[in-house]
UniProtKB/Swiss-Prot annotation:
GO terms for molecular function: GTP binding; GTPase activity; translation initiation factor activity. Residues 488-492 are annotated as: G2. CDD domains: IF2_eIF5B, IF2_mtIF2_II, mtIF2_IVc. Residues 599-601 are annotated as: G5. HAMAP family: IF_2_B (MF_00100_B). This is Translation initiation factor IF-2. Residues 80-89, 98-111, 140-188, 229-241, 300-317 have a biased composition (Basic and acidic residues). GTP binds at residues 463-470, 509-513, 563-566. Belongs to the TRAFAC class translation factor GTPase superfamily. Classic translation factor GTPase family. IF-2 subfamily. Residues 454-623 form the tr-type G domain. GO terms for cellular component: cytosol.
């Protein structure tokens, strides 16, 4: 037999090759493309099937027509069918059940094998064209119907469809005429092909097909409309309740005012009416709330009867829940019919039939009346403070011409403009600098007036060198400490407290030498009363005038003590006249200053002086609050070898306790221990009490203020901040070379400099010595202080001196053995002194180049005190052992304790056992006594030395 290609068949019948290929596949032919060949019989079958599909179905309809029950029913069915045809042509199905298609395809292949190719899958035709494979209608179950070869079986199925009793076809009935004619023709030809006609199978029911998606959308829209109606009703009910409540409240107020104006007896009736109004308000609120809740509950409950019945169903299918239908979409994930089924575990199936969630009403927040802002606030921070969305603020800023994001910082002007736009009064927040402890001394608003009590006066003793300041203080304390001062002058501030007539007085002893100007100014700044001591035989001296100026600058009252009236040349009247020239006028002359003539050496009129001090203090009304955190001033500071930094503090306000976190100057720490002026440990210090504390991380400067903080964290932060600011200020003071000072800079390079390193026992001495050396004026030569610090001379000082070619000046300190050995090796000169004007004179003469032959100190040896013996009417004898060199009878000795010189003097006696000897050699033991010194202690170092005259070349 000859074969034909599919594209030739398509050309012959006037169809596209694609349609012919698909049609051949549906007829069960094994073809792949338009180039595939088929037998002549199969080609005729394809052509005949196309010609049959194009014939009108009027005859078939007329043939089936007598079997219909009633003519009106057929007319309705035909109309309904035509509607479905038009709808199916427009709309496309949303999903395919691939599993069902695979099963149906497998059944088709099995049926073809049994029927030997005589049974083929029916094809839905519309207008002569085959529907696409994935174009499934809602009647997907009727798509694949396989007929058996027996004619009676096919007739039974057709009859069952026509009688509308099949359980598999609940929603449809066949348009019997056309289907039966095709079924008979297929039975005669031996092929059981159930082809769908151009008019398509019409549903059995009289109503159109149910569009579940449209129904779900309509249901959701209906629910939303119902909810909005209920929200509006609820809102109107609430507004009405508020209006009624407001009217009731106004009526109650008017009734109350009227009753009060008419007669006081009607007050009870007014109160009763107010109570009734409040009850009415509560009942209206409750009723409105209950109505809203009930309506909300009704709206949220779904209507169960919506899916129970089909509005056009008849017979047994009516009132049947969830009936099975082959026209129903098999993939029912988005179907309302699936709402009562349990969701499989692990499947996130969204239920589309749930009632819509109510929209949460946004709360309205009122804007604040005032807004306190800080520089650099972000948009998000401002939005949070005024309870607005950041996007709203960004929009307002954009309208103002400012482009900003919610994390961008704004300046003060922009924030104020923004607040003006909102109608809010903007105020800049005043930030308190926690690192500024000076504010406590300027502003006393933090004090509690109820806790203020009287405090002890702080008295500073001022005067010229050797006018008797320390002797007076020694007499007041009943001790002989004045003899211990080198050269008869005080080298640093001493703070002491005495008690007179049941009241305490705090004394500050300041040095009188010109080098200690800053220390005298410091003493005047913390004092309440100044005692100006003037020698009756010397009169007014330069340091006396300076003390007067310091006291006047501090604004403190002055009490003049004319000392040494026991001397033969004493002339108190001359002193009074000289002081009057500087504004210090006695009360006897009509002035304001008290004058007291005393003799500190013989304890004359000392009681009168103390009474005068207490009288002036009472007039000044000195007060303090002991309940606040302590503040005060550093009197002196030094570095101890074993204890570290030690600071002498004067408490001015509050009470200082042990373990208090404290900031002192540019350093910080915690009060580890407190010692009073008598050397006893104390746990607290009240106002006007001097104490020495330990526990600071660095040595502060004398004159620095201190303040106690709430916790150690705050103290550490404040101390570090103050240290950072001080370093920044020091860097800013560095001089830069410019065209104006270029000549001066070049000229300064030609000047010779003398580099010095200063080490002293206390901070005040370091400051005084450095300031004095810098002030020395010698043409062509100047002093450069390379380094100054508190403590003994150590190896690092020697290394620095070698690098900078400097001279080390030790004031009341000694070098360590390692430092001395390194200085000898590196040829570094160390000058040790105990009197400040000796240092100044030596440096000045060296600068002028007029140094005469000088005496050089030569150390003979060192000894350690092993034991002390106190002998009455003789003094203290020290048993010693020589550890280096020798100790001679005519040598001078220094008593060194913790690398600090305690005393410098001559030997009174030197013995080896009971014999007087001229010297005691190395590793030998002996005993010694020192002139005018009895405070020897075990482990003190005795350094023996002599002064050798050398000629300077």
């Amino acid at each position: 037999m000859s074969k034909k290609r599919l594209h030739e068949i398509a050309k012959e019948i006037g169809k596209s090759s694609k349609e012919v290929v698909e049609h051949a596949k549906y007829l069960g032919l094994d073809v792949k493309s338009h180039a595939s060949s088929v037998e002549e019989a199969d080609a005729k079958k394809i052509i005949s099937s196309f010609s049959k599909a194009s014939k009108p179905d009027v005859t078939a309809s007329q043939t089936v027509k007598p079997k219909e029950v009633a003519q009106p029913s057929v007319t309705v069915v035909k109309e309904t069918g035509s509607e479905h045809v038009e709808k199916t042509q427009v709309s496309k199905p949303k999903s395919r059940n691939f599993k069902a298609e695979r099963e149906a395809r497998a059944k088709e292949q099995a049926a073809r094998k049994q029927a030997n190719g005589s049974s083929h899958r029916s094809q839905e035709r519309r207008g002569g064209y085959r529907q696409p494979n994935n174009h499934q209608t809602n009647e997907q179950g009727d798509k694949r119907i396989t007929h058996r070869s027996q004619g009676d079986t096919n007739d039974k199925r057709i009859d069952r469809k026509a009688s509308n009793v099949s359980p598999r076809h609940d929603n449809h009935q066949l348009v019997g005429d056309r289907n039966r004619s095709f079924a008979k023709e297929n039975h005669k030809n031996g092929r059981f092909t159930n082809q769908k006609k151009q008019g398509r199978q019409e549903p059995q029911s009289k109503s159109p097909k149910i569009d579940f998606k449209a129904r779900a959308a309509a249901l959701k829209a209906e629910q939303n409309a119902e909810y909005s109606r209920q929200s509006e009703t609820r809102f109107r009910a609430q507004q009405e309740a508020k209006r009624l409540a407001e009217l009731a409240r106004q009526e109650a107020k008017e009734a109350a005012l009227k009753a009060q104006a008419e007669e006081m007896s009607h007050r009870e009736a007014a109160l009763k009416s107010i109570e009734e109004a409040e009850t009415k308000l509560k009942s209206s609120n409750i009723s409105a709330k209950s109505t809203a809740d009930n309506r909300r509950k009704k709206q949220a409950r779904p209507e169960k009867n919506r899916e129970l019945t089909h509005h056009s169903q008849e017979g047994q299918k009516k009132n049947k829940k969830s009936w099975n239908s082959q026209n129903q979409v098999r993939n029912q994930k988005n179907s309302n019919w699936n709402k009562n089924k349990k969701t499989k575990k692990g499947k996130n199936v969204k239920n589309t039939n749930t009632a819509p969630k109510p929209v949460t009403e946004r709360k309205f927040h009122e804007l604040p009346k005032e807004f306190e802002y800080t520089e650099g606030m972000t948009v998000a921070e401002i939005a949070k403070r005024i309870k607005r969305e950041p996007a709203e603020i960004v929009k307002k800023l954009f309208m103002m011409g400012v482009m900003a994001t919610q994390n961008q910082s704004l300046d003060g002007d922009t924030i104020e403009l923004l607040m003006v736009d909102y109608g809010i009064e903007a105020k800049a927040k005043v930030e308190v600098d926690d690192a500024d402890i000076e504010r406590f001394f300027e502003d006393e608003n933090y004090l509690n007036p109820e806790n203020i009590v009287e405090r002890a006066p702080v008295v500073t003793i001022m005067g010229h060198v050797d006018h008797g300041k320390t002797t007076l203080l020694d007499t007041l304390r009943n001790s002989r400490v004045a003899t211990g001062e080198a050269g008869g002058i005080t080298q640093h501030i001493g703070a002491y407290q005495i008690e007179e007539a049941g009241k305490k007085i705090t004394f500050l002893d300041t040095p009188g030498h010109a080098a200690f100007t800053s220390m005298r100014a410091r003493g005047a700044s913390v004092t309440d009363i100044t005692i100006l001591i003037v020698a009756a035989d010397d009169g007014v001296m330069p340091q006396t005038i300076e003390a007067i100026n310091h006291s006047k600058a501090a604004g403190v009252p002055i009490i003049v003590a004319i000392n040494k009236i026991d001397k033969p040349g004493a002339n108190p009247e001359r002193v009074i006249a000289e002081l009057a020239e500087y504004g210090i006028i006695s009360t006897a002359w009509g002035g304001e200053c008290e004058f007291v003539e005393i003799s500190a050496k013989f304890n004359k009129n000392i009681d009168e002086l103390l009474e005068t001090v207490l009288l002036v203090a009472e007039v000044e009304e000195l007060k303090a609050d002991p309940t606040v955190r302590a503040i005060g001033t550093v009197i002196e500071a030094r570095l101890d070898k074993g204890k570290g930094a030690i600071a002498t503090l004067l408490v001015q306000q509050g009470t200082l306790h042990v373990q208090d976190p404290i900031v002192v100057g540019n350093t910080f720490g915690r009060v580890r221990a407190m010692v009073n002026d008598l050397g006893r440990r104390v746990k607290s210090a009240e106002p006007s009490t001097p104490v020495s504390i330990t526990g600071l991380n660095e040595t502060p400067m004398a004159g620095d203020h201190f303040a106690v903080y709430a916790d150690e964290k705050a103290a550490r932060a404040a101390g570090e901040e103050r240290s950072k600011r001080a370093l920044l200020k020091q860097r800013q003071n560095t001089q830069r070379v410019s065209l104006d000072n270029l000549f001066d800079t070049l000229k300064a390079g030609e000047i010779k400099t003398v580099n010095v390193i200063i080490k002293a026992d206390v901070q005040g001495s370091v400051e005084a010595l450095a300031a004095s050396l810098v002030k020395i004026e010698v043409e062509g030569v100047r002093v450069n202080v390379v380094h100054s610090a508190v403590g003994a001379i150590n190896e690092s000082d020697v290394t620095l001196a070698e690098a900078s070619n400097a001279v080390i000046i030790g004031f009341n300190v000694r070098p360590t053995p390692q430092a001395r050995q390194q200085a000898d090796t590196d040829d570094v000169e160390i000058r040790l002194h105990s009197i400040i004007y000796k240092v100044i004179e030596e440096v000045e003469e060296a600068m002028k180049g007029k140094l005469d032959p000088v005496y050089q100190e030569k150390v003979l040896g060192e000894a350690i005190i092993r034991e002390t013996f106190k002998v009455s009417k003789v003094g203290t004898i020290g048993g010693f052992m020589v550890i280096n060199g020798k100790v001679t009878r005519d040598s001078s000795v220094r008593v060194i304790r913790d690398s600090v010189v305690i005393f410098d003097g001559k030997l009174a006696s030197l013995k080896h056992y009971k014999d007087d000897v001229k010297e005691v050699g190395n590793a030998q033991e002996g005993g010694l006594m020192i002139e005018n010194f009895n405070d020897l202690k075990v482990d003190d170092t005795i350094e023996a030395y002599i002064m050798e005259e050398i000629v300077r070349k």
